[in-house]
C-alpha cells in the first residue's frame, strides 16, 4: 500500500515537473512550440486566411494559414505551388486584405491569376533583379504595416547580387543560404508585429550520394525550415480526365511542419486547369464523409433534395448555387471544429515606426 502511495507521489511530482518544463519552454520559445500530439490543442485567437481548399484548411487545424507567420510551400515542378498561393491571395482579397507578389522567377501569368479569382488590378507586383532587392522590398512592405499577405516566388530565384555580377563558372558556396538566414532573422519579428502573412514558394533539389532516407531537399539552406511556422509539401498524384482529355491534376498536400496545430495531416483535392482548386468537389467529398451530403448510388442529395447524378453534375450544381455550397461548407467546418467562412478577417496591422 505504501509502495502505491509512493508511486502516486512520484507520478504527481513528475507531472508537476513536466508542467513546469512545458511552461518554461513556452515562455522561452513562444506558445505552440510544444504540444501533446493527441490533444489536438491549437493556439487560441489566431487569425487565419483560407487556402481556398476546405480539406487543407481542416488539415491545418486552425481553418487556414496563420497571419503574422512565415509559411513555406514546396514541391516538384508543376505540382500546384503557385496555383495554391494565388488561391490564398484571392481569399485574402475577399477579406479586404492588400496583397503583394514578389515575382523573382519573372513568370507570373496574370490572366491565369485572374481566372483563379485574384483581383489583379489591386495586386502589388515586383519583379526584382537580385535576391537582396527582393528581400529588401519584402522588408519595406512588411514594415509599412499596410500589407496583409506577401508571396515570394520563389526562393530558388533569389539570386545574390555577387552571383549575378560574377562569371558563369564562379563557385560561390553558401551565398544564397547566408542571404536567406540574414533576411529571415530581420523579418520574423516585424512579420509577427504587423500581422502579415509571408509565403515563400520553394523548389526541390536532389542531394547527391544519399543512400538512406529521402534524397530531396529544398533550396536556400536550412534557415527557412526553422523560421517557417507552417511547411506544406504539395505533390501531383494523378490526372483528372474527361474522356481522353486531361483536364486537371489530383493533388496531395502534406503539412510537414505546423507550429499552430499538430502536424503531419494530409489533404487531397483536385486542381482543374484554368479554374484552380475544385472547391465544389471537396465540399461534396467532405460533406459525404461528415454525413451532411447523402450519397445513394450515383446520386448526391442535400436536405432531402437531389443535387446531381455523379460527382461532375453535383459539382456543377454547387457552382451554379454558391449559397448552398457555402452552407454545406460551413456545416462541414462546424462538424470538424474549424472556423466557419468569413470569420477569419484580420485585425488592423501595426505600422512600424
From Swiss-Prot:
It comes from Cupriavidus metallidurans (strain ATCC 43123 / DSM 2839 / NBRC 102507 / CH34) (Ralstonia metallidurans). GO terms for cellular component: cytosol. One of its GO terms (biological process) is DNA recombination. One of its GO terms (molecular function) is single-stranded DNA binding. The keyword Nucleotide-binding applies. Keywords: ATP-binding, Cytoplasm, DNA damage, DNA recombination, DNA repair, DNA-binding, Nucleotide-binding, SOS response. Can catalyze the hydrolysis of ATP in the presence of single-stranded DNA, the ATP-dependent uptake of single-stranded DNA by duplex DNA, and the ATP-dependent hybridization of homologous single-stranded DNAs. It interacts with LexA causing its activation and leading to its autocatalytic cleavage. Its main location: cytoplasm. The keyword Nucleotide-binding applies. NCBIfam families: tigrfam_recA (TIGR02012). This is Protein RecA. Disulfide bonds: none annotated. Transmembrane segments: none annotated. InterPro entries: AAA+_ATPase, DNA_recomb/repair_RecA, DNA_recomb/repair_RecA_CS, P-loop_NTPase, RecA-like_C, RecA-like_N, RecA_ATP-bd, RecA_C_sf. Pfam families: RecA (PF00154), RecA_C (PF21096). Belongs to the RecA family. It is found in: Cytoplasm. ATP binds at residues 75-82. The lineage of its organism: Bacteria, Pseudomonadati, Pseudomonadota, Betaproteobacteria, Burkholderiales.
